Amino acid sequence: VPMSSRMPTILMLRMDEYHEKVIVNKDNIRIIGEARDRTVITNSGCAKDLDADGKEKGTFLSYTFLVTGNNVEVENLTIRNDAGDGSLVGQAVAVYAAGDRGVWRNVRMIAHQDTLFCGPTMPKVARDALPRLIPEGVTSVGDCPLTLNRQYFEDCYIQGDVDFIFGPYRCWFERCTLFMNKRGGLYTAANTPEQSPYGLVFHNCKLTGECAPGQAYLGRPWRAFARTVFLHCEMDEHVSPQGFQDWQGGAPVTERYAEYGTTGARADQSTRHPKQKRMTEADAAAYTIREVIGGYDNWHPQHRTPTWFLCGDSTMADYPANAAPMTGWGQALKRLVPENVFVENCAVCGRSSKSFVAEKRLNFVELCLRKGDKLFIQFGHNDEKPDVDRATDAHVTYPEYLGMYIDAARRQGAEPILLTPIARRRFDENGKLQHTHGEYPAVMRDLADYRGVRLLDMERASEKLLTALGSEGSKVLFNWQEHHLNYPDGVQDNTHLSDTGAVRMAQMALTLLEEAQ
C-alpha cells in the first residue's frame, strides 16, 4: 500500500477468521470483506493485560482494529474483541477510529466494555501507529474553526455494554443497530470538546439488546461538554425510560443531550432525564450530515468519487518496475483520467473471461461496485487459447461469461462497458496487418447491441493506428527492446505494450468513451 496516493487502494479480505491486531496507518484505503458475518478480524486484548514492565496496558492498547489513516473506508466485515466481560478483564476495544473522514459500512463491531472508540491516538498508542494529534494551541484552519476528526457509520451493527460507543470525535450513525449485552449498561459515553458544536449523532438507528428491560441507558457524559443526540430512532423495552444518565461523581446530563422523533416501546419521552433537551422539529432539522461532519472541507461521505473498475488481461494489467517498459494500458489510464475519477485496475495477466470468474475475481469486483461507477470489460486474447481453464466458445460460453460481468455491474447500479481486445502487432510479408482474434470481437459487438451496453471498439481503432504506423513504425507501441536493464537479451513482444503504446491505447479508450456518450 503506497504511503500516499490520490486514488484509494482496495484491499479485499476473503471469508475467514483472522486472529490478529490490525493497524491501518496509511491514507486512502478501502478494506472490504467477502461476507460480513464470515469475514472476521478478532483479538482478545484487554486493559488488564500487562506490558513488558509489568504494568497494565490500559484501554487504548486493547484494540483489535486501529485506524490512524485518513480517508479509510471499511466495509462488509466483522471486528471483535473476545476478551470477555469487562467486570473481569476491564475495557476491551474492538475498533479504535483515530483518523479523519473515516467511513464504516455494513460492519459488525462486537465486544463488551468500550467496543468503539472515536478519538485521537493516545501517547501509548503512538508508539505503535502514526499519531494524528491536533497541535496544541491550534484553533482554526485558515478562516474556518478547527474541525475535529470525523467518522461516518452506515448500516453497522455495534454490540457491547458499558459506554460501548465513546470518544470526542464528531460522528454520524445512519441506520445502525446498537445492541446491549445481557449485563446492561450505557450505549454511549461522549467526551466532546467544549469548542465542538456536535458530538455523537444517531439517525434512523435501532436500539435493542438482551439485558433486562430498562437496563440500557442512552448514554452518560464522559466530560462536562459532551454532546449526544438521537434522531428518529427506534428504541425497544431494553432502553431505560429515563434515557440518559449522569456520570456518577462526574459530569451531569445537560441540554447537550437530546432526542427527537423516537419510536418503539420507549417513544414516550415524558419520563426522560429532566435536564436533557426537548427538541423541536426545527432543532432536529438543523442536524444534517453536512452540518455535523462536513467541516471546513465540506466533506459528505454519501457523495463519493466514482470509480472505473477494469477487468481484463495482460494488455490492460498493471506491471511492476522490473517489467518496465512493459505497461498495461489500464496502468497508463490512471495518469490520464480527471481528478474527479478513480481507477481501480483489476486486470490480471493471462486471464480470460472464464478464468477471471472462476477465480472469484468478479465476485470481489462486484462487492466494490457502487452506483455511479463504471465496469470496463475487455477479454478475448486468452479466451481463444486451447487450455480448458481459459478457453471459451466464441458463440456460446464467451457471451455467457461477458453477460455475467454486465449483470454484476447492473446489480450494483454501475455501468458496464464492453471493449474489444486491442490488435496484436502481426503483419504479413506484404506489410498487411493480420486479424488475430477470430470471431470474438464480432460476438462482443453483437452482444453490446443486444444488451444495450456501450461498446469501445478497441480492436478496430488499434488496427487503424497500427496500419497507419506500419510494420516498423508500430514497434514503438510494443515491448520491443534490443537492450534494456530489465531485458538484457532483448525482447520482441507483439502483444504487450510499451509505456508509449499503453498511453496511446489509454488515450484511445478515453476518446472512444467520449464518442460513445
Predicted segments with their positions:
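Sequence-level preference for short, compositionally simple segments enriched
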Residues: S4-R304
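Structural motif
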Residues: I10, E73, T307, D373-F376, ...
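A cross-domain feature marking catalytic cores of carbohydrate-active enzymes
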Residues: M15, P120, A347, F379, ...
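Conserved beta-strand segments of alpha/beta enzyme cores
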Residues: R30, V40, F342-E344, E415, ...
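Short, surface-exposed alpha-helical segments at coil->helix boundaries
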Residues: R38, T327-Q331, G438-A442
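Serine-esterase "nucleophile elbow" of acetyl-processing enzymes
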Residues: Q302-A347, N363-L375
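Acidic/histidine-rich helix-loop elements
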Residues: A317-P325, A347-E359, K385-A394
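Alpha-helical cap/lid subdomain in secreted, periplasmic
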Residues: R361-V503, Q507-A516
